[in-house]
Amino acid sequence: MNDKEFGQRVRQLRENASLTREQFCDDELEISVRQLTRIEAGTSKPTFSKIQYIATRLGMGLYELMPDYVSLPERYSKLKFDVLRTPTYENEELMEKRADLMTEIYDDYYADLPEEEKIAIDAIQSTIDVFETKTAEFGQDILDDYFEQIHRKKQFSVNDLLIIQLYLINLRMEVKQSSDFQYFLELVEKFPSQVELVESGDLFILRDVMITSVGLLGQKEEFSYIPTLFEALDKIMQKTQDFQKKPILNLLKWKYELYANNDSEEARRFYEEAVMFAKLIGNAHLIDKLEEDWQIDMKTAEYSGGV
């Protein structure tokens, strides 16, 4: 069954059930009217989660609706995982390696991906582009299409988190509208509860979103939101026993102690722990970045009378 045939089948079954697209999509948190329209027209390849939702709304089993569903290619899934799991810390060699992985995804897999996977890849690439160019000029079409829907959700999917990360990176570069930062604060209040809702294998994506959020909160001096995020980040690391980003978490903690609590002794403790973890994972480039950042913070704090 190709995309056009599947779309026709969904439309016929929906109409047989006497449901309008608006009724079918309900609150549009799982699928929007626009997304359903594209699926029914055969111009959008639905993902597994969308097919599951459609089947549930139609009151039938997944394979009753689409018996020839094929899962994502194993190589593609590995490439995507490696891109998301490998931090570069502005290391040019690692940035080039990540670019090569993304090129392979676009060249070998992108054209045949379901729409939701295409959105995920485009969100990842746009986030990389914003970060590397330091300009909020990428991924705006994704945010325009999906962010409002995501903002209203109580539970976030992996795709939602990737789009939120894109939103945060853009926001870090430029606050375009006064409502943008308020939306961000509303999202921040939802993040801690997601620790129990997100699949354990995907918690590292939530972790990265919260790390970006802490950095943005510190940048805007909204310190009161930060301790709750620290607790959630510590919980994720203990739950997953994944301490890959522990040096970065400690970097954020030392900055919080310096700039929010004016406590240079506690800040130094977190700095030393950050360097220790960076040494444990054998990342010399990260150690240099941590030491450089610490020296800058010490001079800044001293200048402002905080040391």
In which residue ranges do the predicted regions lie?
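Helix-turn-helix repeat elements of alpha-solenoid scaffolds
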Residues: 88-105, 132-148, 177-191, 220-232, ...
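DNA major-groove recognition helix of helix-turn-helix/homeodomain DNA-binding modules
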Residues: 49-64
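Flexible helix-coil transition and linker loops at the boundaries of alpha-helical arrays
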Residues: 104-117, 132, 146-161, 191-203, ...
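Short alpha-helical DNA-recognition segment
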Residues: 17-38
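A short, Lys/Arg-rich alpha-helix, primarily the initiator
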Residues: 1-17
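Alpha-helical adaptor scaffolds
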Residues: 164-260
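Helix-turn-helix/homeodomain-like alpha-helical modules used for DNA recognition
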Residues: 74-132
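"A position-specific structural signal for the A-helix of alpha-solenoid helical repeats
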Residues: 81-84, 117-128, 166-169, 208-216, ...
